[in-house]
Amino acid sequence: MQCQKCENIAVYTRKYSGESLCSECFSNSILRKAAKTISKYKMIKNDELVVVGVSGGKDSLVLLSILKKMSETHNFKIIAVTIDEGIPGYRDEALGIVKSFCSKLDVEFRTYSYKELYDVTLSESLELREDEKTTSCSICGIFRRRALDHAAKELGANVIATGHNLDDSLQTFLINTLSGDSNKIGWMSPGSDSKQIRKIKPLAEIYESEIVFYAFTNDLPFQTEPCPHMNEGIRTEIREFLNSLENQHSGIKNNMYRSIIKISEVMKDVSFKEKRICSNCGNQCTGKICAVCNMI
């Protein structure tokens, strides 16, 4: 089969569009998609410093690679930041991969750990939880977001970029819907209009399967060992359900994503909560005490 953009042999076919592409044209299409998302939501401005959250997985390393290429032709800088949760036998491999890749790209690299920020590792925090229904992913997510905020403030960054893809958004929407947490539905936009540090998701309109193929076709290293806590919640089941739907009805993920963004915009004002200052640590929150302090 021939690439529809050039005369080379096609190696990838997008079922939802019927488009067959060679390796180079496929990679260029991913770069264009990310650039279009960044432009559409005005994610990065001139002279800004972007902290790129890099876990060592495929999404974050693809994001780092793309933003590095863009920073060479656009006026912004990037710093890679990895958060060490303190999961025995898991995080060490990722740290090695990220450090080596950042050295290859000539990107500044920093690490921050839960232990140094909160005086507990993720494993230790799980022993402190009052309710077993509170999953490790919930705790880790709260800690990770605060850690990235801390890193961005310390480094003087304007923006935090994470590697969340289209599939992640669909899964999160369904998790919040099924758990009755409608307040979080209003914050699904991949961009941010915050006057403080902005949170952006440049890969938010790209399928997870395409990010995997981009990583392989560009020989990007990434950690394949899954987090030992990944199956505690229902995300894995939802991922499999959505993949099954996509296999039977090509393009259904794209349709659902567009609907979610529209719903999120409608829900944004309804979900709005005035920001307060945590009486314990001084960070912004929506209650008297922030989620991090409530946990530790």
Located regions from the model:
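ATP-dependent adenylation/nucleotidyltransferase module used to activate substrates
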Residues: 2-175, 179-186, 204-218, 290
